[in-house]
Amino acid sequence: MEREKEQFRKLFIGGLSFETTEESLRNYYEQWGTLTDCVVMRDPASKRSRGFGFVTFSCMNEVDAAMATRPHTIDGRVVEPKRAVAREESAKPGAHVTVKKLFVGGIKEDTEEHHLREYFEEYGKIDSIEIITDKQSGKKRGFAFVTFDDHDPVDKIVLQKYHTINGHNAEVRKALSKQEMQDVQNTRNNRGGNFGFGDSRGGGNFGSGPGGNFRGGSDGYGGGRGYGDNGYNGYGGGQGGGNYGGGPSYGGGRGGGYGGGAGYGNQGGGYGGGYDNYGGGNYGGGGNYNDFGNYNQQSSNYGPMKSGGNFGGNRSMGGGPYGGGNYGPGNASGGNGGGYGGRNRY
């Protein structure tokens, strides 16, 4: 029987005691299944634990079983298990944010709340479902929000980008609230704009390609090499990828990509800054999802950034409130600097 892809079987374990070894980590997680890999990430020079590691199970059901029995305590310390983020996703802003709300795009006019509930309740307990409609016409705008009682269902769902709901392909993303978007704005203002998400050697901008407003210099968020070893580059963010997050970033470099604290930004843009160019249109203002209109007319908590005030480049992908670039990782034209605290995260 062919084994499931590693990304579905792998857990990131943060908050480890510095005394925790691979043996004690393995012994703890083997209670839920067979481990095919177990590692505590260490500083290459001092060999001291960096306080996080990875465990890979033989199947996703074992991951589900482990996550269903949180909290986990190892060597007297409560640790933070999360489903690992694949390399190609880890550099995207928001990939490491812990949220309970899911954005579902691409749903069709004939999709009702019960279709969404029937599909997503298999992943976890649902608190609410909101299908967004146009306030004036009442017409569905092609996307919805599903809120769970825990972050793990969202983490599990977004491991697979597309889901077939009511016979149609829908795209899923983590959803951020207005407050979380505002936190990004505030951080930008506080730091004077001298930073970038950076998806290429620590530079980067808050935009989709050339012309971004916020070039990354030596203080760039997500720059540098980050933590991690080459053996784990399958879950890194590329050189200088990384997340835009608080706390010590667990990654963003060759082996990390697992941001600590609360990262900000929607994964790849989401409904915020261009829907990741999905379909070539700016979500909420142009050529995507039946041209459902501008999101800024909605009263939802998941509201808009003002036009021109979003974190984007010079180009607009559509006519909506998010014109101004994709809220995704930039192509990094500014600087080769390091991560949040300096040029090198080692």
Curated annotation (Swiss-Prot):
Keywords: Nucleus, Repeat, Ribonucleoprotein, RNA-binding
Residue numbers spanned by region Nuclear targeting sequence: 297-340
GO cellular component, one term: catalytic step 2 spliceosome
Entry-linked PROSITE patterns: RRM
SUPFAM superfamilies: RNA-binding domain, RBD (SSF54928)
Keyword Repeat set for record: yes
Chief site of localization: nucleus
Localization per Swiss-Prot or TrEMBL: Nucleus
Alphabetical GO biological process terms: mRNA splicing, via spliceosome
RRM domain ranges (all copies): 9-92, 100-179
Region spans: Disordered: 182-217, 326-346
GO molecular function, one term: mRNA 3'-UTR binding
Record field: compositional bias (Gly residues): 193-217
Cysteine disulfide links: none
Functional summary from the UniProt entry: Forms complexes (ribonucleosomes) with at least 20 other different hnRNP and heterogeneous nuclear RNA in the nucleus.
This protein's name: Heterogeneous nuclear ribonucleoprotein A2 homolog 1
Species of origin: Xenopus laevis (African clawed frog)
